[in-house]
Amino acid sequence: MKNLLEQIQSRLDELNKAERKVAEVILQNPQQATRFSIAALAQAAAVSEPTVNRFCRSFGMSGYPELKIQLAQSLASGAAFVTQAVAEDDGPEAYTRKIFSNTIASLDSAHKLLDPRVIDRAVDLLIQARQIHFFGLGASASVALDAQHKFFRFNLAVSAQADVLMQRMIASVAHTGDLFVVISYTGRTRELVEVAHLARENGASVLGLTAAGSPLARASTLCLDIPLPEDTDIYMPMTSRIVQLTVLDVLATGVTLRRGVDFQPHLRRIKESLVPTRYPLDEDN
């Protein structure tokens, strides 16, 4: 279950203008908000005290005292970082802090919500696959390419596609034993959802790395739920790629461990093959 800070963050777009001001003051500095009186919070948000009370009730709380209690509990549970949108008047210190804080918050949120049992089932799909196709579009396309770079090392037939037409053609000739790993921040990209349905109709399995409850999640055989609240109205997605890449690192580690120690010489040979391509370290410089 989401703590209060996570609930506020996830519902920002649902709040009316006045209540959103309250939410933004809380998210900007939750530690300070726990010390505010209702009058101080209303003043900081430039709203009335009744607006603060309505904000509390919209989150199922009886009033402001309960909000302060739940806010303190959220901070005590380790939710010290919450995402903050980059503003047009932010200076280098502010936007640097926000980007790092947003990334930390997203990684922490994803870690808490990932079910180890689902991770284990995802590793099963990867190990058992006859061939694996990594699909992504937009910002997720580079993540799909990185996955191909990781997973070819396991003696698996892998490919990565960022072209919609290629994705459809490959899905149209899928077979039982094929695995399609479809990566999408929103899970609402029509082309990717259609490809997932097409692959499953032809007997393949689909592993979705996407938002829970999204059309892509529903179209997938198995979904790794990746909660990624971020400001995408003006600025390009920032934290989504980091979380997706980290989840793929988790899956790659799971596959490596399943392969066992006998597989380590194979991985070592791949790594050692790159040694001649690098200049030696010059300890004097």
From Swiss-Prot:
Keyword field: DNA-binding, Repressor, Transcription, Transcription regulation
Start and end of every SIS domain?
122-261
Q: HTH rpiR-type domain location, by residue?
A: 2-78
Keyword Ribosomal protein included in the entry's annotation: no
**One MF term from GO for this chain?**
DNA-binding transcription factor activity
Q: Which residues bind DNA?
A: 38-57
Question: One biological process GO term for this chain?
Answer: regulation of DNA-templated transcription
The superkingdom listed in its UniProt entry is Bacteria
**UniProt-listed InterPro entries:** Homeodomain-like_sf (IPR009057), HTH_RpiR (IPR000281), RpiR-like (IPR047640), RpiR-like_SIS (IPR035472), SIS_dom (IPR001347), SIS_dom_sf (IPR046348), WH-like_DNA-bd_sf (IPR036388)
What is the role of this chain? Answer: Involved in regulation of glucose metabolism. Transcriptional repressor of the gap-1 gene and of the edd-glk-gltR-2 and zwf-pgl-eda operons. Acts by binding directly to an inverted pseudopalindromic sequence in the promoter region.
Q: Which NCBIfam families match?
A: PRK11302.1 (NF008451)
Q: What is this protein called?
A: HTH-type transcriptional regulator HexR
